[in-house]
């Protein structure tokens, strides 16, 4: 008897589902793509229990006949391909004919559909691959697909799913991607019978982006200069450096209305920005139209990655579009800086358009918004003022933002304040004693020589010369002292008027999951509605305008780490790292403190760099110095 056998159709579909149906968001992706391919103008998505309990996608598209409805659940059945040549000129989102049978094999599946010209519709039911007899149904024109009890017959797959909160955040992110790709389509999303959003169709991409982002992001949008290359055109919006993230959560890239994640495109984006800080990723909304014959979308199971036939043309066009846009925007800011700043007035307290006042937008100063390589040199060394109101409004009005905040009034005193700044007389006495001890300790091997430009401390060692940056050293010292007393609460400042922020659903899920750990780290954060949080206190020394950026950086660090085990440590160390940096760099350090600081630094667990990775000590060996003078080492 042969050991090789042909899998049953049901088993084959369940195996294929491993690639097609990774999580509830994968189901939503496939179903919404089918709706869009059917020409829908309104797509409604409903989920329960993160999508595991139920997913329902309803559209007003073309619908299907009974024959097509029965065939669409068969493997490799599709209306979008009839020859190999068509594969290389595909314009549809889906084309393999694997999604519906794979989904139906691991769930309780129901499809109701009706064509506009038909008097009645049809209902198809499949339970874990077991098909029921089709029956007529009185439904509206279009298609409605309901997927219940996802992975009920493959419990091993269900174990790999995250919490309902996390899975729901991925579902919402997937819907947002399609809503950004198709602003001309109305999208509605309900979660556990609660309406999350209902986005009306619009011809203005900025309106759709503004509806799905917070006010700070919407106000900072920079239109990309439409750029046309060989077989490709680029448009969209850029965001300044202040909106950069440690992950690519802020990057939305679409190719022929298809959300894509491609390393080639990522490199082109970085090259376009030029001089971008290591470890950060620029935020943008990039829309590419590429001739179908010049791109292969059949290279990834989920069709997230693509392969370009003329990749150099794609890279050059993206780089040109981004670089030209940044340069033009920088010139506009420099020009606006020459004009007098218009007088600004605050809206009255009873205003109906902004009842609580808007959170101030981030600075768009060209000195802070973009890398130096992406903007022309200023005419003088004077700081450039922010972009004027008239320049900001040159691209059309932005609809009322969803991000609101009550004006901040900080409590003057901080809670749990730690005093790292010693009185000068105490420092003098202690340093004199420690300096003498350091000089008597021959094993220390460091002889203090003095300072360089009142900024660096110089020490002679048996191996050569050591330069220490006292403030960077103090940053490391303060960080490790705070880390050693982790049980103590982080110094914080209470906000009389809490700040309310709207967030990306994935960021909101992380914050909601680990909010208790934030308290010890000095930031009290509580959920405040769908994808909205309220900040009630922030770490001492943290300015309010940096609270959002600081919170998102913490989310990125939690996402990058194994936060299921280390969330408390990551949250605490992120906050104390920021506290140590601000505390150290605000200190006034006199030169005679250098030896004592060095001694404290060398007692640290990691003395050679700050928590952020910047060096605290730089060593020049004697052989290296001799080589500089042309002497034999």
UniProtKB/Swiss-Prot annotation:
PANTHER family: DNA MISMATCH REPAIR PROTEIN MLH, PMS, MUTL, DNA MISMATCH REPAIR PROTEIN MLH1
Statement: the UniProt record of this protein carries the keyword Transmembrane helix: no
Family of this protein: Belongs to the DNA mismatch repair MutL/HexB family.
The keyword Magnesium belongs to this UniProt entry's keyword annotation: no
A GO-annotated cellular component: mismatch repair complex
NCBIfam families associated with the record: mutl (TIGR00585)
Disordered, as annotated region: 338-407
Biological process terms in GO annotation: mismatch repair
Function: This protein is involved in the repair of mismatches in DNA. It is required for dam-dependent methyl-directed DNA mismatch repair. May act as a 'molecular matchmaker', a protein that promotes the formation of a stable complex between two or more DNA-binding proteins in an ATP-dependent manner without itself being part of a final effector complex.
Keywords: DNA damage, DNA repair
Coiled-coil region: none
Protein name as annotated: DNA mismatch repair protein MutL
Residue ranges, compositional bias (Low complexity): 366-391
Any one Gene Ontology molecular-function term assigned to this protein's record: ATP-dependent DNA damage sensor activity
Lineage summary: Bacteria, Pseudomonadati, Verrucomicrobiota, Verrucomicrobiia, Verrucomicrobiales
